[in-house]
């Protein structure tokens, strides 16, 4: 059996995998164990009571975190005319149409978010094989296809997170960084859960939010007592 590292021993001593911690204690514990030499991302996994094999139970959406993600977001926008001008005014990192599509097909893909105005989807649609596998394909459900291009760019720059249930019915999202205080992380988590509740499929029966786990990039998952979040 492989020998445990000092960090692994510390985590094993501090985290009881069979215990669900009050949310504030869970967040404090995750921050305490985030000891890497960089500000680790604080992430949440939310297990939903849905059947992701059914198309009407796929949960997909976006949330503007009130305290952001702590990450500087690179945003590309497909738009023209006034929408292109508005995107540039909001700080988009790249704005264009066919020219931007050609650059992306050539490998220029170092963006966190790709946004498109509805009239640009004819151009963007051809990029499905390039953007789709990277989770960058614009979609109305996540607010990345929008007539309000300026607002979409503003939200992305402010720390909007996008998510979709995986094959196990779990949503994964960042809620901040290890250098955030617990209150900021809590506010971000509350905002995410509020939006997830709004997205509950009408065909989903029983308990909707079944489990919540928070973790840092290099740390262990810490289960959260749902009752302390009111869900």
UniProtKB/Swiss-Prot annotation:
Pfam families recorded: Ribosomal_L1
GO cellular component: cytosolic large ribosomal subunit
One annotated GO biological process: translation
A single GO molecular function term of this UniProt record: tRNA binding
Keyword annotations of the record: Repressor, Ribonucleoprotein, Ribosomal protein, RNA-binding, rRNA-binding, Translation regulation, tRNA-binding
Keyword Repressor: yes
Keyword check for RNA-binding: yes
Superkingdom in the source lineage: Bacteria
Record-stated family: Belongs to the universal ribosomal protein uL1 family.
Annotated InterPro entries: Ribosom_uL1_bac-type, Ribosomal_uL1, Ribosomal_uL1-like, Ribosomal_uL1/biogenesis, Ribosomal_uL1_3-a/b-sand, Ribosomal_uL1_CS
Phylogenetic placement of the source organism: Bacteria, Pseudomonadati, Pseudomonadota, Gammaproteobacteria, Chromatiales
Protein known as: Large ribosomal subunit protein uL1
Complexes and interactors: Part of the 50S ribosomal subunit.
SUPFAM superfamilies in the cross-refs: Ribosomal protein L1 (SSF56808)
Purpose: Binds directly to 23S rRNA. The L1 stalk is quite mobile in the ribosome, and is involved in E site tRNA release.
